[in-house]
Amino acid sequence: MNRKVAIVTGTNSNLGLNIVFRLIETEDTNVRLTIVVTSRTLPRVQEVINQIKDFYNKSGRVEDLEIDFDYLLVDFTNMVSVLNAYYDINKKYRAINYLFVNAAQGIFDGIDWIGAVKEVFTNPLEAVTNPTYKIQLVGVKSKDDMGLIFQANVFGPYYFISKILPQLTRGKAYIVWISSIMSDPKYLSLNDIELLKTNASYEGSKRLVDLLHLATYKDLKKLGINQYVVQPGIFTSHSFSEYLNFFTYFGMLCLFYLARLLGSPWHNIDGYKAANAPVYVTRLANPNFEKQDVKYGSATSRDGMPYIKTQEIDPTGMSDVFAYIQKKKLEWDEKLKDQIVETRTPI
């Protein structure tokens, strides 16, 4: 039986779980698939594994697909934690076949309700596609003295990839970076690559993801690794729902469906539809023919049918961003020498 290993960061999110569900549905027959669940804390690991087991038992794949589980405790805002995650992977796995970089941390501080109401009434479609009323904190640094969102969504995952490159090469892996519909170039200043001066650090981090992908996918291809960047469209997210009550959440859903009815392809609403593109590029796309310098998006038609829609990526600033991140990587290679500790606990 052929063995494959899949690491999904942010497995406990709505999108992360649905990526795993779709991977289970589409994986080849007669495969033993090890799903490496990632989390910052151990209690959440078992909860997520139980959810995946429940889906698998109902999926109709029990007879032709064997799955097992492992876990990885990693906090991408802590570079020692990132190094320990590499240490754990290096001890246990010779090859990795899938890596889904589903890092989507934001430092939200609520909603500008006056601005939200104004946007909804003046341009409802734009209000639920490219909202500007989400309040994000500015200037937040990690304990490693980096921009928190820069480290969480970009540098931490990139550093992890650089460390496990031998395993990814042996597995002829697919790397999938999860970007966003809101990764417009306007959200990133090359004078603020760590996103410390902006009030749109989340969106800026996704722009960095786009550029980092463009800067690296060709070299990875030479190693037999296929890297893609995707965006899941717009869907219900647990992380932002905490700022909504029952009525505002229901209102948001109504506006999402209205936007889809008015022709928006990006209002997937459901996390399962949002996970379409991440799994499409690993299971259905042909890397010999399909372009890797575009972004693959999860889209949905007016009548709710999911499909894939590609978007061009503006490469402006790619070289500057890559040079900055490479320099930062060398700095942390030096800082992290001999700083590995054992963190695993049996589950």
UniProtKB/Swiss-Prot annotation:
Gene Ontology CC annotations of this record: endoplasmic reticulum; endoplasmic reticulum membrane; lipid droplet; mitochondrial outer membrane
Keyword Transcription found: no
Pfam families reported for this sequence: adh_short
Membrane association type: Peripheral membrane protein
Swiss-Prot/TrEMBL keywords: Endoplasmic reticulum, Lipid biosynthesis, Lipid droplet, Lipid metabolism, Membrane, NADP, Oxidoreductase, Phosphoprotein, Steroid biosynthesis
Catalytic site positions: S179, Y202, K206
Subcellular location: Endoplasmic reticulum membrane; Lipid droplet
EC number of the protein: 1.1.1.270
Record-linked PANTHER family: 3-KETO-STEROID REDUCTASE ERG27, DEHYDROGENASE
Name under which the protein is recorded: 3-keto-steroid reductase ERG27
